[in-house]
Amino acid sequence: MKIANGQTVIQLFERWSPKSLAVEGDKNGVLIGTLNKPIQRVLTALDVTESVIDEAIELGAELILAHHPIIFRPLSSIRTDTAYGRIIEKAIKHDLTIYAAHTNLDITKGGVNDLMADALGLKDIEVLAPTTTESLYKLVVFVPHTHTDQVREALGRAGAGHIGNYSYCTFNSKGTGTFKPEEGTNPFIGKQGALEFVEELKIETIVTEGQKNKVVAAMIKSHPYEEPAYDLYPLANEGETLGLGRIGYLHESMTLEEFAKQVKKAFDVPTARVVGSLETQIRKVAVLGGDGNKYMAHALRKGADVIVTGDVYYHVPHDALMDGLNIVDPGHNVEKIMKQGVKEKLEKLLKDKKYDTEVVASSVHTDPFTFI
């Protein structure tokens, strides 16, 4: 079996959901333990409670990948005679590593908010509250004609060359490369001390900030030269906008009451708080996992008929109603959708690299509320 170590697991995860996406002041990354160990099993969880710790121990998971940080505010002490202290003590005693992916997982493509939008069947989905725009880079590499297809394929597989809904986009131009292999080299073409003239193809493509290291590594691995010549430089073009929340359209309009029932079914919750006339027709829907109180204005500006979010304060709906915005609040816990979503994504990332590390979604229910 090929088992990934903790560093590898998190490197793969952060290529998809980099910590750099997180909002300022957020707590992300390793909060307890170390990544310097083999990881046979990863447990994905929304919250880290004592029951989740017990589940990880029972399953033999060495790493808990959670959405909500177990440590959010600075600690002045860790008292093992308190419930919170016992959780930390138990994690350390059983050599568990706890990693949090909070707002970066909300923001990243395919993360919490995309999972929520997909669960509701939305189409024409956009970002609700932009936080950043991806930086773009131009990668230029010079390849002998014998290996151009191989290098182009490696670039595309690594994610380079995406422009809108087009992939594998490159520009190719012919030219002549020159080089003289010096002492200690093992040239693919030519011999030491002799100036070589080689017909080469210049392949140009576009990569994002988050992709560039992976793409360059794939290019170097596929290139026949021991020292490939390439350029990587930033572009003034702006890449894709990333941010919190999503907004899109239902495939067909329905009443607010019908939509609220759909929300309950999609997120498997027993109840939802609804703000607005139940007969109102709903077509354009905003979603924001977690606490969406600060994002009502974003939903209004983008023309949403309703926003689906959690933890709505008492006075916020009064303003929303005056502005004509309906609200469905199924609770904060609907972010539990990330457990299965992250499991499937991380599982694929590991399998693509031929690792046998297992990923398990937590079965522990961590919603503190009971509905009667």
Curated annotation (Swiss-Prot):
Superkingdom classification of source: Bacteria
Signal peptide: none
Binding site for a divalent metal cation 2: 68, 332, 335
One cellular component term from this protein's GO annotations in UniProt: cytoplasm
Molecular-function annotations in GO: metal ion binding
Family: Belongs to the GTP cyclohydrolase I type 2/NIF3 family.
Subunit structure: Homohexamer.
Listed name of the protein: GTP cyclohydrolase 1 type 2 homolog
UniProt organism field: Halalkalibacterium halodurans (strain ATCC BAA-125 / DSM 18197 / FERM 7344 / JCM 9153 / C-125) (Bacillus halodurans)
